[in-house]
């Protein structure tokens, strides 16, 4: 054990992870601190335009570089990694050039046909945003290859400072909503420039290439553009579907309210979810070879679901009050979106790490098909909800439909490793009912006596009961 720990510290693995994780936390903290100022400078419709813009850029970015950048850290020989960097950079520049050409000739026509006319004044920012976002993604993969983990960490902090600084400065001088869009572009540009400076300083970008190395690299990692790219596109389309759908059928205000609720409610997932997912993959792979994957996954599912369901739903019930105080009175309606989204978001905190079982169990093809199914069901939910001509109700139906499919996917993958589906559904139902029972009285008090001291006491008691009961339950079952 001592030898192992020495090797770990010698390789600086823990040090590198702490750089990235710590920087991500600092960057998120900066975003949260600045958000109350931005929410008072910009309107919900301004944030709606930003959301639609970032959705379009995010989807297009999945095509850039043909996804070869994901293979940069993989080759053992440096010459093949450099060949991949060259290929993905050239493909990225060609794709962005094509976007500029399309924007010039048919950009306005396409945006009008897909009901995104709100982006027409900012048409040329779309390919520019794809350029800086793709450049940062490629630069980050090269930095991982070169071990520039401290640089990656600092660029995330720099992105938060420069991006939010640009949004504040441009908003104060009345550049709305352009300030939000330019701030997003500035953030990505600052990140990639920092990594490129570190690479130039180390002289790791000075190299020669051969056609043979390029050809071998392209052929060996051809699955990235053939399969991985389309999986990523489907995933990103599913993630951004509500924003685009709300902009199609309702208003930019609805998009802004939804985006604010979803982003704030998903903060625990963005901060904790990625770290939990990485740990789960490492421990799950080990458990697979030990023959304990089923018991480990069941315990992980029970713990993560319990620790996410009650806190996130409780936070969502308080969202109308918290958003009005934290963001300003114009954002109170965003709290309603948080309430209807809460079951889906709470389950997503468990769902995201558990989906790593597809990779651990070698079920990549099933994951692809299930991702398509989830996207189609989410689209159906939004479309059916639109029949009532109410954006909040549309989001509610979307949330419930998504929740059902996510539960089905987890039941499927857990049953595939030896856990009965009935048992998975029983655990899920019991955790949902536990949260509902603990939050029933606090919700009633909040609805009718939200200014009473007794309401505060009821919420505190509910939280104490949740902590004590689950600590006792987990200790009794030897889960902790």
Cite the ranges covered by each PLM segment:
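Helix-loop junctions and terminal segments of transmembrane helices
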Residues: 62-80, 144-145, 261, 265-301, ...
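Hydrophobic alpha-helical transmembrane segments
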Residues: 51, 120-127, 153-203, 262, ...
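Interhelical loop/hinge segments that connect adjacent transmembrane helices in multipass membrane
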Residues: 1-9, 195-239, 279-295, 415-429
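Transmembrane alpha-helical segments of multi-pass transport proteins
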Residues: 102, 373-377, 397, 424-480
């Amino acid at each position: 054990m001592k030898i192992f720990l020495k090797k770990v510290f010698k390789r600086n693995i823990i040090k590198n992870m702490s750089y990235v994780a710590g920087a991500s936390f600092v960057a998120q903290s900066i975003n949260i601190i600045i958000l109350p100022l931005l929410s008072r400078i910009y309107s919900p419709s301004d944030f709606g335009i930003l959301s639609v813009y970032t959705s379009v850029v995010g989807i297009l970015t999945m095509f850039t570089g043909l996804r070869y950048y994901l293979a940069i850290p993989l080759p053992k020989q440096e010459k093949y990694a450099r060949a991949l960097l060259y290929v993905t950079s050239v493909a990225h520049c060609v794709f962005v050039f094509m976007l500029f050409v399309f924007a010039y000739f048919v950009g306005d026509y396409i945006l009008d046909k897909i009901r995104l006319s709100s982006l027409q004044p900012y048409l040329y920012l779309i390919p520019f945003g794809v350029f800086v976002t793709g450049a940062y993604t490629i630069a980050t993969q090269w930095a991982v290859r070169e071990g520039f983990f401290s640089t990656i960490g600092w660029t995330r902090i720099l992105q938060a400072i420069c991006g939010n600084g640009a949004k504040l400065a441009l908003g104060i001088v009345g550049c709305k909503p352009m300030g939000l869009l330019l701030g997003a572009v500035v953030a990505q540009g600052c990140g990639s420039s920092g990594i490129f400076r570190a690479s130039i300083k180390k002289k790791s970008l000075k190299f020669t290439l051969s056609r043979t190395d390029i050809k071998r690299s392209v052929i060996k990692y051809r699955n990235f553009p053939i399969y991985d790219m389309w999986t990523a596109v489907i995933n990103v389309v599913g993630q951004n579907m509500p924003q685009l759908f709300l902009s199609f059928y309702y208003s930019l205000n609805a998009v802004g309210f939804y985006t604010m609720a979803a982003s704030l409610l998903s903060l625990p997932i963005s901060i904790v979810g990625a770290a939990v997912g990485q740990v789960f993959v490492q421990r799950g792979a080990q458990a697979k070879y030990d023959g304990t994957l089923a018991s480990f996954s069941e315990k992980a599912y029970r713990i993560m679901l319990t620790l996410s369901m009650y806190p996130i739903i409780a936070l969502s019930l308080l969202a109308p009050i918290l958003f009005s105080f934290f963001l300003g009175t114009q954002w109170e309606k965003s709290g309603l979106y948080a309430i209807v989204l809460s079951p889906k978001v709470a389950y997503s905190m468990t769902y995201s790490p558990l989906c790593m079982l597809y990779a651990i169990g070698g079920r990549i093809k099933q994951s692809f098909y299930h991702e398509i199914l989830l996207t189609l069901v989410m689209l159906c939910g939004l479309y059916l909800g639109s029949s009532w001509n109410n954006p909040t109700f549309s989001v509610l139906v979307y949330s419930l439909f998504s929740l059902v499919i996510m539960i089905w996917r987890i039941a499927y993958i857990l049953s595939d490793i030896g856990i009965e589906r009935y048992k998975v559904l029983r655990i899920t139902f019991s955790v949902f009912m536990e949260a509902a029972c603990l939050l029933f009285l606090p919700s009633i008090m909040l609805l009718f006596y939200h200014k009473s001291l007794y309401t505060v006491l009821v919420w505190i008691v509910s939280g104490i009961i949740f902590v004590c009961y689950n600590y006792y339950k987990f200790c009794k079952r030897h889960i902790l």
